[in-house]
Curated annotation (Swiss-Prot):
<dbReference type="Pfam" id="PF20259">
    <property type="entry name" value="tRNA_Me_trans_M"/>
</dbReference>
<keyword id="KW-0694">RNA-binding</keyword>
<feature type="disulfide bond" description="Alternate">
    <location>
        <begin position="97"/>
        <end position="192"/>
    </location>
</feature>
<feature type="site" description="Interaction with tRNA">
    <location>
        <position position="333"/>
    </location>
</feature>
<dbReference type="Pfam" id="PF20258">
    <property type="entry name" value="tRNA_Me_trans_C"/>
</dbReference>
<protein>
    <recommendedName>
        <fullName>tRNA-specific 2-thiouridylase MnmA 1</fullName>
        <ecNumber>2.8.1.13</ecNumber>
    </recommendedName>
</protein>
<dbReference type="GO" id="GO:0000049">
    <property type="term" value="F:tRNA binding"/>
</dbReference>
<dbReference type="Pfam" id="PF03054">
    <property type="entry name" value="tRNA_Me_trans"/>
</dbReference>
<feature type="active site" description="Cysteine persulfide intermediate">
    <location>
        <position position="192"/>
    </location>
</feature>
<keyword id="KW-0820">tRNA-binding</keyword>
<keyword id="KW-0547">Nucleotide-binding</keyword>
<dbReference type="InterPro" id="IPR014729">
    <property type="entry name" value="Rossmann-like_a/b/a_fold"/>
</dbReference>
<keyword id="KW-0067">ATP-binding</keyword>
<dbReference type="InterPro" id="IPR051305">
    <property type="entry name" value="tRNA_2-thiouridylase_MnmA"/>
</dbReference>
<dbReference type="InterPro" id="IPR004506">
    <property type="entry name" value="MnmA-like"/>
</dbReference>
<dbReference type="InterPro" id="IPR023382">
    <property type="entry name" value="MnmA-like_central_sf"/>
</dbReference>
<feature type="site" description="Interaction with tRNA">
    <location>
        <position position="121"/>
    </location>
</feature>
Length: 354
């Protein structure tokens, strides 16, 4: 079996290479470059990444190929993120990167030449009723199925997740014992293309600043100013620059550039327990066979907690009623649905409050 292994320079993908080689495979290694050339601030740690990837390839006598997809990434993933922010929504570029770049453009460029593509994602492949499903990882803290919830059946059919049955500490132990070049490297945080700058600085470069009012939700009183609604997301409590906190962002008026905040943030009163998903995407198929309601697990952000609730259908919307109050439901983010035992990731849709 011919295997392409996506390698990033991190410990997870290096352990994937080690495990594949231990099983007798000789995968071809691929590093996907997505950082923007010509701007030292807006680049990933590509040079260091490639050095570690090269060392890993050399250790196992494998070939390393560098695939430059930075233009496709910026034209699709970054453009998507900026568009969502302009519309007052909260984007998830990691989800779109997996769908469009890692398992989209890469498949067109090189992946189609291989039987399987292996990655360091914490997820698993399950077979049920003769079909392939995206399964959750053994390690709930590291589970990344929510980042994979927009891929399609053809993509999931080609993927291998060798780390799916391992805990993170076990992965670290394997890397240490095998003396992998990246064994001591820290896990990456945040969005890769941001490089050396933070998210707000990235938004400032592309969207600028525009002063607007901060209004207390309960009283309608103006209590401060902000530099643009695009710097703030629903549920946010840091970075508002207000005294007497904590303050939470409750709502955004993008037409008037107003941020509404609340001092107490009572989730029952501010949001309740219900939200909707539109344009729902099934990875394999409808696990619930079109049933009008079903018990489900779900996530509304990247977290180690699978929430419990009830799914109902209304026209083109999936409505979710959570068993417990939710904080910071952010329109634009992906709501990810699982079976009630949180073993199968069924798919995802974009969160809306309508």
């Amino acid at each position: 079996m011919n295997i392409a292994a996506l390698i990033s320079g991190g410990v997870d993908s290096a352990v994937v290479v080690h495990l594949l080689c231990e099983q007798g495979y000789k995968p071809d290694l691929f590093y996907i470059k997505i950082g923007m050339d010509g701007d030292e601030d807006l680049t990933c740690t590509a040079e260091e990444d490639i050095e570690l990837c090269t060392a890993t390839a050399r250790k196992y006598g494998l070939s390393l190929n560098i695939i430059d997809l930075h233009r496709q990434y910026w034209d699709n993933v970054v453009a998507y993120a900026i568009d969502k922010v302009k519309r007052g929504l909260t984007p998830n570029p990691d989800v779109m990167c997996n769908k469009l770049i890692k398992f989209g453009c890469f498949e067109q460029e090189a992946g189609h030449l291989y039987d399987k593509t292996a990655t360091g994602h914490y997820a698993s492949i399950l077979e049920k009723d003769g079909k392939i499903w995206l399964g959750t990882a053994q390690d709930p803290v590291k589970d990344q199925t929510d980042f994979l919830a927009q891929i399609d059946y053809l993509q999931i059919s080609k993927l291998m997740f060798p780390l799916g049955g391992l805990m993170k500490n076990e992965v670290r132990d394997i890397a240490r014992i095998a003396k992998l070049p990246s064994a001591q490297r820290k896990d990456s945080q945040g969005i890769c293309f941001l490089g050396k700058i933070n998210y707000n600085e990235f938004l400032r470069r592309f969207l600028g600043e525009k002063e607007g009012d901060i209004i207390e939700m309960e009283t309608g009183k103006r209590i401060g100013t902000h530099k643009g609604y695009w710097f703030h997301t629903i549920g946010q409590r840091k970075g508002l620059g207000l005294g007497g906190g904590p303050w939470f962002v409750i709502r955004k008026d993008i037409d008037e550039n107003i941020i509404y905040v609340s001092h107490g943030y009572d989730t029952d009163k501010q949001y309740g327990t219900d939200f909707a998903l539109h344009d729902f995407h099934f990875i394999t198929e409808d696990l619930w066979k079109g049933a009008p309601s079903a018990d489900v697990s779900f996530k509304i952000r990247h977290t180690d907690t699978f929430m419990k609730g009830i799914l109902t259908r209304e026209d083109n919307l999936f409505r979710i009623h959570s068993h417990v109050p939710l904080q910071g439901i952010a329109p634009g983010q992906f709501g990810v649905l699982y079976d009630k035992n949180a073993e199968i990731c069924v798919g995802s849709g974009e969160i809306t409050l309508s």
